[in-house]
Amino acid sequence: MELSRVLDNEVKLRNAIYLLMSIVNDTAVPRNIRRAATEALNYLRDERYTPGVRAANAVGVLDQVSQDPNMPLSARTKVWQVIAILETIHD
């Protein structure tokens, strides 16, 4: 049972990383939002912490930037998708 949860968390992290990479590579997204997405990516890739801690750190960054009124709707939707994925990751 433990192995399936670990694998499930890894799949969720990969999906979140993929969505964040699409935000980082989108030049239509303002620089401060791309910077926050990069910071969230760095948290997700930091192997020193458990998946739950990495996800919580990334959610903190993304939640703050999701309130930005200059964020394009497509990027906001992706940020919300990432937050929804990351909130399901537990240790």
UniProtKB/Swiss-Prot annotation:
Family to which the UniProt record says this protein belongs: Belongs to the UPF0147 family.
Residue ranges the record marks as coiled coil: none
A Pfam family assignment: UPF0147
InterPro entries: Ta0600-like_sf, UPF0147
Organism expressing this protein natively: Desulfurococcus amylolyticus (strain DSM 18924 / JCM 16383 / VKM B-2413 / 1221n) (Desulfurococcus kamchatkensis)
Source lineage: Archaea, Thermoproteota, Thermoprotei, Desulfurococcales, Desulfurococcaceae
Name of the protein in its database record: UPF0147 protein DKAM_0139
